[in-house]
Amino acid sequence: MLIEPQSRYQDEYIFLFTEKPTALQLLSRVLITRWILCLLWFMTLWAEADKLEGYAPEVAALLQEYQDTSDANGSTIPSIFAYRPDSSGRTLIDFESGLIVASSETISGLKQRIVEVLLTQIDPSVIDAHTAYDLGLINQKTKKPFFFNQIKDHDGESIESVWRAERFANFLIYNELRHAGDFSIVLSMVATHKQLAGAKYVRYVLESTRSHQINPSLVMAIMETESAFNPMARSRSNALGLMQIKADTAGRDYFTRIKGYAHTPSSAYLYQPAQNIEIGSGYLSILARRYLVGINDPKKLEDAVIASYNGGAGNLWRSLNSSGNRKQAIARINKMTTREFYWFLTNRHIRSETRDYVRKVRTRISKYEALLTNNGNGALPVAINPIEIIAHPPTGLFFQSRSIA
C-alpha cells in the first residue's frame, strides 16, 4: 500500500533520496553528510572535555596528552605507562610528574585498579611472575612492590600488604572519587619519587659503566631524561625501556661492535632494566670511541655524546659544518672552549629537541654526581662502594686509551 507523504518537506525528502539525483542534489547530500560528521565530532570533543572538567590542571594535561598520543598498544610518551588489563578500566602512571590516574566503569573495578598499582599484583592472565621479576615490578630480594616508598597512604605509611592497600583504596574511593563517565581517582607519589625510582637501577649502572669506562652520572642523567625511570617506556619511534633503545640502531650497533656478532635485540630483551642499561652504556661508549673519536677535551666529548645520543652524530656534524663534513666539524669543536661548545649545542644545534636535551642532561649530571658521591646526605638511598665511584671521576668521562672498531 502506498502511503502518501505527510507534508511537502517529507515529499521533498523522499524525492531527494529515491529519485536519480541531480548534481545539485548530490552536492546537498555531501553537505548534509559533512554536517552530520562535524556535529558528531563536536559532540565527541564536548564529551571528552566534560570528562576532563574538574580535574586539576596538571591531571587534565596528563589525560589530554595521553589521549592525543596513545595508540593501540598504549602510551607513546616514554614517561607515561598505561596499564589496561581489560576494557572496563585503565591506570595511567606518569613517572615524570608522579601522578597516577586510575579509572573503571564500576567502583569494585576501580578498587581493583588501585590495589593493583599499589601492590603490582600478578595476575597470570596479564603478566606472569617470571616476567614481573624481570621487569623489576617486584624486588626479587625484598619482595617489595614496585612503588614501595614512592607512594604513601593517608597515614604516611609505605604500602606492601594487601590489607594496607585495600584500606588505602577504600579511603581514596570515599574521599577522592570522581564520576564523569567512569569512576576515577588521582593519586600523587611522594616528592622524591624520581630519586627513589632511580635508586633501583644504580647497581646496574655501576656495573655497566665500570665495564665500558664511562661516567655513571651521565647514564643516570640520560635515563631520567629519556624515560623518567619508567622501565616499560615506549616512544612513537619504538625506542624502548629506561634508556630508550632502538633495537635496529643502537641495539644492533651494540651487539655488532661490542659483542662481536650481528643481532637485533627483541622488545622483551630491551624491557629488562639490566640489559637495557648495559646496551645504553655500551652505545655511549661506541659514540665516544668510534663515531666521535678525535674530540680532544673530555668535557666537550661528553657534551658531544649527549647531543649525539639524542640527535645522532650526523646532525652534530651538520650543525657545525653545512656539508656535514666530520673532519671539519671536529676541527671546529677542538678550537672551541668547553663553554663555547656547550653554548653552541644549546643554541645552534639544528634540532631544537637536542638543544633542550643537552641542557637537561647536563643539569642532571651535576645532580647525580652529588647524589652518587654523597650517599647518606640526601643522596640516592642505596649502598654504594666508594671504590666504585672513585673509578669513575666525574670530571673525566672516558678513558682515551681504548677504541672500538
Label each residue range with its predicted role.
Residues 276-325:
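Catalytic and binding regions of secreted/periplasmic enzymes and modules that target cell-wall glycans
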